[in-house]
């Protein structure tokens, strides 16, 4: 593997080399040290594979994965790669099966990923076949450890990664439980192609500073302003975060007008204001919560719009974002209508998040030829801890703290 030439400058995580988003050798190392390393990769929802034989195909980084429930009701995950010649084992996005068979040479696997059958293993009429020394038990796709937390299914290639609860930490666990405290149903899906390196989008998710500056909808309709009550939680590793806020319609705030911020635009109006009409369902008054888990999982609650997002790298300058919109299984008909309508707020063409799908590409294009220069990530200081305010980049610095540890690029004393 070619060695990365990334050079970090300074004694903090406030300077990030632009080359980190364009260096192909570094991207190759990410696959081994992060996605196949000591992390928990989000794979799917437990409710997406409710019965024996139900499966989904997904990815851990670039590695294709099969996730399936067996007759023992346990969930198993293994590489979607035939042990014979490397073809995909499962071609469908989802389905139900008693077993898997590769279409190329008909090698078969059970629902736990064990190789169970080799076509013409003994040959034909005494000719050919596999050698007597061939042992099916010694061949098969690599298997992942599986952990389920609040209906979220995670997988890891590492035997050394902590339990999912310890990996997340108590504050992140509590905030996931806050949203996923009862059974959910999938009510919609999108897959979005992003014209940028995966890290640019994950920074964006963690960046509470940008939200009311980039997104006109957030600011104009006062769904999210930095002046609102809220805060940022960063776990001890730095890799996981929560940003949250509460709408206060009675609070007068002219700070955006005073600074002539573009995103505060009184001429921007809705023909159908019912889009903003919802219902109270969380006793803490939090109207927006964005939660991320390293390296690529997001859980959102924006008003009554609940969704999970899975971020996957596809090349050095492109990534894929899978959106899965959720409702609670006990939603009333009216509540479900509200969730479906508010799905227009957040998504590839959402009134709020459409800009996020573009701005990463603006950065990817803007840093061409600047690999030896640095991004400045100093809003709110140089620490990576939790914050009572959201005019900060603390959780972005936390991401780089975790990233550098996994990549072996920590700051030198």
UniProtKB/Swiss-Prot annotation:
Q: Which residues form a coiled coil?
A: none
Q: Which SUPFAM superfamilies match?
A: Bet v1-like, ISP domain
Q: Which UniProt keywords apply?
A: 2Fe-2S, Dioxygenase, Iron, Iron-sulfur, Metal-binding, NAD, Oxidoreductase
A GO term for molecular function: 2 iron, 2 sulfur cluster binding
Its needed co-factors are:
Fe cation; [2Fe-2S] cluster
What is known about regulation of its activity? Inhibited by EDTA.
This entry's comment on the bound cofactor is: Binds 1 [2Fe-2S] cluster per subunit.
User: Where's the Rieske domain?
Assistant: 41-144
Does this entry carry the keyword Oxidoreductase? Answer: yes
The residues listed in the UniProt record as binding [2Fe-2S] cluster, with positions renumbered to this chain, are 82, 84, 102, 105
The entry describes the temperature dependence as follows: Optimum temperature is 30 degrees Celsius. Approximately 60% of maximum TPADO activity is observed at 15 degrees Celsius, and activity is completely lost at 50 degrees Celsius.
Per its UniProt entry, what is the enzyme's top EC class, as one word? oxidoreductase
Q: One Pfam family name from the record? A: Ring_hydroxyl_A
GO BP term, example: phthalate metabolic process
Q: What happens when the gene is disrupted?
A: Not affected by disruption of tphA2I, however the tphA2I/tphA2II double mutant no longer grows on TPA.
From the UniProt record, list the reaction(s) this protein catalyses.
Answer: terephthalate + NADH + O2 + H(+) = (3S,4R)-3,4-dihydroxycyclohexa-1,5-diene-1,4-dicarboxylate + NAD(+)
Give the enzyme's EC designation.
Answer: 1.14.12.15
Summarize the pH-dependence annotation from the UniProt entry.
Optimum pH is 7. About 20% of maximum TPADO activity is observed at pH 9, whereas no activity is observed at pH 5.
Any keyword RNA-binding?
A: no
Sequence similarity: Belongs to the bacterial ring-hydroxylating dioxygenase alpha subunit family.
> What function does the entry list?
Component of the terephthalate 1,2-dioxygenase multicomponent enzyme system which catalyzes the dioxygenation of terephthalate (TER/TPA) to 1,2-dihydroxy-3,5-cyclohexadiene-1,4-dicarboxylic acid (DCD). It can also use 2,5-dicarboxypyridine (PDC) and 1,4-napthalenedicarboxylic acid (NDC) as substrates, and preferentially uses NADPH which is the physiological electron donor.
The molecule here is called Terephthalate 1,2-dioxygenase, terminal oxygenase component subunit alpha 1
Q: What is the lineage of its organism?
A: Bacteria, Pseudomonadati, Pseudomonadota, Betaproteobacteria, Burkholderiales
């Amino acid at each position: 593997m070619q060695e990365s030439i990334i050079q970090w400058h300074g004694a903090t995580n406030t300077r990030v080399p632009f080359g980190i988003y364009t260096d192909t050798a570094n991207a190759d190392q990410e696959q081994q040290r992060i996605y196949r390393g000591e992390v928990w990769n989000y794979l799917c929802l437990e409710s997406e594979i409710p019965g024996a034989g139900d499966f989904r195909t997904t990815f851990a980084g670039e590695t294709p994965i099969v996730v399936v429930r067996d007759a023992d009701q346990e969930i198993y995950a293994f590489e979607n790669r035939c042990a014979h010649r490397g073809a995909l084992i499962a071609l469908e996005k989802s389905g139900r099966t008693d077993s898997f068979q590769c279409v190329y040479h008909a090698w078969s696997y059970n629902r736990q990923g064990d190789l169970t059958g080799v076509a013409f293993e003994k040959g034909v009429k005494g000719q050919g076949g596999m050698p007597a020394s061939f042992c099916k038990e010694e061949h098969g796709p690599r298997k992942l450890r599986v952990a389920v937390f609040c209906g979220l299914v995670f997988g890891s290639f590492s035997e050394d990664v902590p339990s999912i609860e310890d990996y997340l930490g108590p504050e992140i666990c509590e905030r996931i439980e806050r949203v996923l405290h009862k059974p959910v149903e999938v009510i919609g899906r999108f897959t979005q192609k992003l014209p940028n390196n995966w890290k640019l989008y994950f920074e964006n998710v963690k960046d509470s500073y940008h939200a009311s500056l980039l997104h006109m909808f957030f600011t104009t309709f006062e769904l999210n302003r930095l002046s609102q009550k809220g805060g940022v939680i960063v776990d001890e590793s730095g890799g996981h975060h929560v940003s949250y806020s509460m709408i206060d319609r009675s609070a007068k705030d002219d700070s955006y007008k005073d600074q002539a911020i573009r995103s505060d635009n009184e001429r921007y109006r809705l023909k159908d204001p019912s889009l903003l009409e919802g219902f109270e369902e969380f006793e803490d008054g939090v109207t927006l919560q964005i939660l991320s888990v390293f390296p690529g999982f997001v859980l959102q609650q924006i008003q009554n719009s609940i969704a999970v997002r899975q971020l996957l790298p596809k090349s050095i300058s492109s990534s894929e974002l899978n959106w899965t919109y959720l409702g609670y299984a006990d939603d009333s008909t009216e509540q479900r209508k509200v969730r479906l309508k508010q799905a227009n707020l957040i998504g590839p063409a959402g009134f709020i998040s459409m800009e996020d799908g573009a701005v990463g590409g603006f950065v990817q294009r803007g840093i061409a030829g600047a690999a030896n220069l640095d991004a400045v990530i100093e809003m709110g200081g140089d620490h990576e801890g939790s914050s009572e305010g959201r005019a900060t980049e603390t959780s972005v610095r936390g991401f780089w703290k975790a990233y550098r540890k996994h990549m072996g690029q920590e700051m030198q004393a």
